Swiss-Prot record:
Example GO BP: L-histidine biosynthetic process
Group of enzyme by EC: transferase
This protein's encoding gene: hisC1
GO molecular function: histidinol-phosphate transaminase activity; pyridoxal phosphate binding
Protein name: Histidinol-phosphate aminotransferase 1
Amino acid sequence: MTSPSPDQVIRQEILALSAYHVPPAKDMVKLDAMENPYRLPPFLCEEISRIAADTSINRYPDPHAAALKEVLSTTLSVPAGMEIMLGNGSDEIIQIIMLAAAKPEAKLLTIEPGFAMFKMIATFANMQYIGIPLKPDFSLDIDRMLAAIERHQPSVIFLAYPNNPSGNLFDTSALEKIIEISPGLVVIDEAYHPFAGKSFIGRLADYPNLLVMRTLSKLGLAGLRLGLLAGRPEWLSHLEKLRLPYNVNVITQLVATKIMQHYDVLQQQADAIRQTRTRLRTFLENLNGIEVFPSNANFILFRLDGASQIFRLLQQHGILVKNLDNSHPLLKNCLRVTVGTPEENDRFCNTLQDLIAGN
């Protein structure tokens, strides 16, 4: 009997994919992944150590993560009557939504450039992907969006608010129009809410087809891999059927519950990031030949000639940013830098300034 080859078994669209690439970052100033650069204070680290030591890791975690859900609902101001579903990061939640909605010929609609996982997971789920370009300034082309919704009748619309990789908030009235005319679900991804201050989570009761997604990764808990989805129980009760058992491990549940009881610590760190974002933006704006785009997130998108070469030179100097050049026509010659600590930002700024002067 002849052994089957991968191309005989695996779907062609999966064979055509490239695996998501995470560049090596050992011993680098890591400014590429929108992580919170600050560690937790010593008193919290000590409490976490005690929690880990006392945890029965030989037992499965609470399958419903009830204690964690309770503190998250309160801390994040989830409206009464709404429920939350937890995921092993937001990526799992995105995948659950798409798997649930992937009827034959079902379509996912989003904007471009946007979060790369929307398109990738649409392929996983075998959904048709529709990407609507933003305007050159990365604002929402609302007329084009509304026309696309009318034409394609998407089952699900995903919109990041603020957007990644551009960092800007879309016009609220435009998003309201999209939610109102959509024939299916609209999922607002608020991964960067701590740095933006605006949210649709308080509007969940206003729109029966609205879901709001959050993550704790950008707040400072990226290593725990915890995302959440807030919305009406009639939606979440069905999505829960696709959530794998025990998807949020016991350490994540207990540690996140403890940290969320000290949410003010994370808020103070987010405040510090917003302040250093302003200083970083001002520095970049004063460099010759750089176009800096407005940001309501914990990163800044900027454009300069020879971006890919600058990216490689920064790497050689031990600094890792995100190279977006050639990833989308609107991102030609664009790099994205995460807001780091003041020391990390200074090293990046001084190195970038020297590289530009050397060119």
